[in-house]
Each structure stands twice: as C-alpha cells, then as structure tokens.
C-alpha cells in the first residue's frame, strides 16, 4: 500500500534535521525504508509480481547509495541513522 500523507509527514518530522527539512539524506533514507518494508510485505503475498520486485530492488539500491554518501560525508550521522532505523549495517 502506498505511503499516506500522514505517515509521510510523521516520518519527515521524526528524521528531519531542522524545520522544513524534507531532502536531507536521513529523511530520504527513512522514507525509502518505509516504502521498502511495505513492498516487501506485498511481495510475500504476491510472489510472482516481478514488476514490483524490480521496483523494490531499485529502491534498495537508491537507499544504499544514499547511505554510502552519508557514511562518506558524516560517519556519526550515518551510525545514528542506522541505529534509529534498525538496519543491519
């Protein structure tokens, strides 16, 4: 299911680094993580939905690139975000 406007605003408010922040790597990664989790649940029921699976793989790649950027720019923000989101790395 798609991300509702309320869910999106809640995620933005939680991970924003300052007021009005919607584009920081933290916010983008958090939004992608929620979309990835939702799509993963969808694919558990619809195993043959290969178009959505491709979208999932693209989102995972985008998130990985953003995390690599954040790690390169500010390792402390990276570690904090990984811990807050509960990601493996």
From Swiss-Prot:
GO terms for molecular function: rRNA binding; structural constituent of ribosome. GO terms for biological process: translation. Keywords: Ribonucleoprotein, Ribosomal protein, RNA-binding, rRNA-binding. Pfam families: Ribosomal_S15. GO terms for cellular component: cytosolic small ribosomal subunit. PROSITE patterns: RIBOSOMAL_S15 (PS00362). The keyword Signal does not apply. One of the primary rRNA binding proteins, it binds directly to 16S rRNA where it helps nucleate assembly of the platform of the 30S subunit by binding and bridging several RNA helices of the 16S rRNA. Forms an intersubunit bridge (bridge B4) with the 23S rRNA of the 50S subunit in the ribosome. Belongs to the universal ribosomal protein uS15 family. Part of the 30S ribosomal subunit. Forms a bridge to the 50S subunit in the 70S ribosome, contacting the 23S rRNA. HAMAP family: Ribosomal_uS15_B. This is Small ribosomal subunit protein uS15. It comes from Bifidobacterium adolescentis (strain ATCC 15703 / DSM 20083 / NCTC 11814 / E194a). The lineage of its organism: Bacteria, Bacillati, Actinomycetota, Actinomycetes, Bifidobacteriales.
């Amino acid at each position: 299911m798609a991300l509702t406007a309320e869910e999106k605003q809640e995620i933005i408010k939680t991970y924003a680094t300052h007021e009005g922040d919607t584009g920081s790597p933290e916010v983008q990664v958090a939004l992608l993580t929620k979309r990835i989790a939702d799509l993963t649940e969808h694919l558990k029921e619809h195993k043959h939905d290969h178009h959505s699976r491709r979208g999932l793989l693209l989102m995972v790649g985008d998130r990985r690139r953003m995390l690599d950027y954040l790690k390169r720019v500010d390792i402390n923000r990276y570690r904090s975000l990984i811990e807050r989101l509960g990601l493996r790395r």
